[in-house]
């Protein structure tokens, strides 16, 4: 049995950041043969800060999307390092900014579940939050991602009302507040132009004022002499964005085109016109963001070669090729093959049936309605099977909630094992811990094999197949994991991917390993390659014997 002991560093209050000074990157340190003690200490501090800056940059870069023409190492990284040097020298939080989260696609039939944020938005917000959390593990001031909602720039072009844009943003705020995502901040054009004191607080006020603000934004911040066709021919990033917009518009406006029985040529022309308008408006919006926040790490959810800004993935387990997949254009679902939540157009046209589910926040997602998800299926207790709830966890894994006191013997253990091969770890809530017996453990090992483990927690006692050891201190504050049946040199390597990933993310400690309580159990398949894109040098694995 292993214990993962974590020390949480308190967050530091954000202060006003001064403008970024010009750095002379050509300078080199030169030292006399004999250094005074204070000079030597200063040199050591500078070297330590430089190493810290490199580690922070490595964390941020691990979220990027790397296309075939990626120029991060050559072009963007030197600028990123200069910005991070300033933050570290001032002991300021790392400020990252991303314009994103406009509104849900208007194509509710084929692309999204509805107009409100769902589990896709939740997972992506937790993903952005993990950037700041990981930075804080090595740099106490931490970091935060400021999301600047850009919905007002484009909603009228896609037939989405101002009221719907406001409600979508409010839903995002509720997710962040309820999950306590302390490394996420929000901003919008009202905040950036008129100040936080003048931001609309009601849907009616927002709808009555947004038109005038948009006119001012596009009039005042549109670049002088901007020529779209010239930029498209010279800037590969503009061409990528343009193609990406057309790609989304073809599906976002599919119902609009169908109702008007538009020809293919008319559809292409309409999408091109709208995409041009979106890019022109986006230029003005980017200029506003740059002016309002002159010192920041600029993130982007659009494809690019990573020269002027850093293109990032919105989910942890896939880079999604060149084009990021966004939750506001897609449906979140659990299937039979992916190791984590997937995002795509509604998966309702294939052979696999899906059912609508919701997490503990009431956010929706789809779940494959297949035997492996029917972990309780007893003819004499049909109501019990209906009460089983599945909830995807960030960045991987699954929580299964059952009515409190449910005997573990009611589970179809072969289906639990099959599910664990896709979603690992699985955390069960609500089980009766006294029902976990050696016979059940033997049954699970028989159907699952030696590479899987099932652990359950009694009050202060972790029970496995053959051992029961008292946990020192508070059981609720302990993090631990069952070691597989292998011993010696074969045991530890099987667990290293899980332990490394679990120790690396603040969110994992709270939401995947969870605060275990009586009645919670964990099933893990140690063969699963966990979907966390962490480089080895960024991992901090803390463990000890229980």
Curated annotation (Swiss-Prot):
One of its GO terms (molecular function) is oxidoreductase activity. The keyword Repressor does not apply. Its EC number is 1.-.-.-. Keywords: Oxidoreductase. It comes from the Eukaryota. InterPro entries: Isocyanide_synthase_DIT1. Isocyanide synthase involved in the biosynthesis of isocyanides (or isonitriles), a class of microbial secondary metabolites. The presence of an isonitrile moiety within a compound imparts unique biological (cytotoxic, antibacterial, and antiprotozoal) and chemical (transition metal coordination) properties and enables synthetic and biochemical applications. Belongs to the isocyanide synthase family. This is Isocyanide synthase B. It comes from Aspergillus fumigatus (strain ATCC MYA-4609 / CBS 101355 / FGSC A1100 / Af293).
